[in-house]
């Protein structure tokens, strides 16, 4: 019978950092609220949660990398919102932010949850930040909790 590994959804005793962009703060503040709601519902101690605010999505990977290399956190949560405009700026920012965040996780071994909204319209962003489409900040925090526990289990099993 194969052995199955799966992360638990308890945040008790885990340390988190949330990197959140100030740009589009009317969206990112809602994402942050959703993430904090998920963490506290799952038993996280607010004293073990650090919130780091950066100017925009472009800066998220740099700060996330710095925090991951400190190895003080069980998981990191990245929150920002990139909304398509009339220029190609969206494509550069959204793509590079996603690549940078993925790189941090794979290079450091620290789970990094992706709560970066990339939407075509403001309405879509609002929907995904707590209106019709749930709250992607909440979802990202739950992913961070699960991955922190899964990696802890896998590292203890070897």
Swiss-Prot record:
Protein's UniProt keywords contain Nucleotide-binding: no
One Pfam family this sequence matches: DMRL_synthase
NCBIfam families (alphabetical): lumazine-synth, PRK00061.1-4
Gene: ribH
Organism expressing this protein natively: Solibacter usitatus (strain Ellin6076)
The organism's place on the tree of life at top rank: Bacteria
Pathway assigned in UniProt: Cofactor biosynthesis; riboflavin biosynthesis; riboflavin from 2-hydroxy-3-oxobutyl phosphate and 5-amino-6-(D-ribitylamino)uracil: step 1/2
Keyword Nucleotide-binding: no
Active site: 89 (proton donor)
Family that this chain belongs to: Belongs to the DMRL synthase family.
Keywords: Riboflavin biosynthesis, Transferase
Protein name (record): 6,7-dimethyl-8-ribityllumazine synthase
InterPro entries listed in its UniProt record: LS, LS/RS, LS/RS_sf
E.C. numbers: 2.5.1.78
Sequence positions that bind 5-amino-6-(D-ribitylamino)uracil: 23, 57-59, 81-83, 114
Source taxonomy: Bacteria, Pseudomonadati, Acidobacteriota, Terriglobia, Bryobacterales
Residues holding (2S)-2-hydroxy-3-oxobutyl phosphate: 86-87, 128
Function of the protein: Catalyzes the formation of 6,7-dimethyl-8-ribityllumazine by condensation of 5-amino-6-(D-ribitylamino)uracil with 3,4-dihydroxy-2-butanone 4-phosphate. This is the penultimate step in the biosynthesis of riboflavin.
Any one GO BP annotation for this protein: riboflavin biosynthetic process
């Amino acid at each position: 019978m194969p052995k199955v590994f799966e992360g638990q959804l308890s945040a008790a005793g885990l340390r988190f950092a949330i990197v959140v962009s100030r740009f589009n703060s009317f969206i990112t503040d809602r994402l942050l609220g959703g993430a904090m709601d998920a963490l506290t519902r799952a038993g996280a101690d607010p004293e073990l949660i650090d919130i780091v605010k950066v100017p925009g999505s472009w800066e998220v990977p740099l700060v996330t990398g710095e925090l991951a290399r400190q190895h003080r956190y069980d998981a990191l949560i990245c929150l920002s919102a990139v909304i398509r405009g009339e220029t190609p700026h969206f494509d550069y920012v959204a793509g590079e932010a996603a690549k940078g965040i993925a790189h941090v996780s794979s290079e450091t071994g620290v789970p990094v949850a992706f709560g970066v909204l990339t939407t075509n319209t403001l309405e879509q962003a609002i929907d995904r930040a707590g209106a019709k489409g749930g709250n992607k900040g909440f979802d990202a925090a739950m992913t961070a909790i699960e991955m922190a526990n899964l990696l802890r289990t896998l590292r203890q099993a070897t």
